[in-house]
Amino acid sequence: KDALEHTGFAPKKDGEEHVEWNYN
């Protein structure tokens, strides 16, 4: 998966939801 697919979100893992690491 693209690591920068979601701005402000960590890359999606296999079957896991995106992790919010910088949403503020």
UniProtKB/Swiss-Prot annotation:
PTM info: Glycosylated.
Region of interest called Disordered, as start-end residue ranges on this chain: 1-24
Protein function: Calcium-binding.
Tissue expression summary: Nacreous and prismatic layers of the shell.
Species for this entry: Unio pictorum (Painter's mussel)
GO MF, one annotated term: calcium ion binding
Repeat as UniProt keyword: no
Domain of life: Eukaryota
Protein name as annotated: Calcium-binding shell glycoprotein P50
Additional remark text: On the 2D-gel the determined pI of this protein is: 5.6 and 6.7, its MW is: 50 kDa.
Taxonomic lineage from the root: Eukaryota, Metazoa, Spiralia, Lophotrochozoa, Mollusca
Glycoprotein as UniProt keyword: yes
UniProt keyword list: Calcium, Glycoprotein
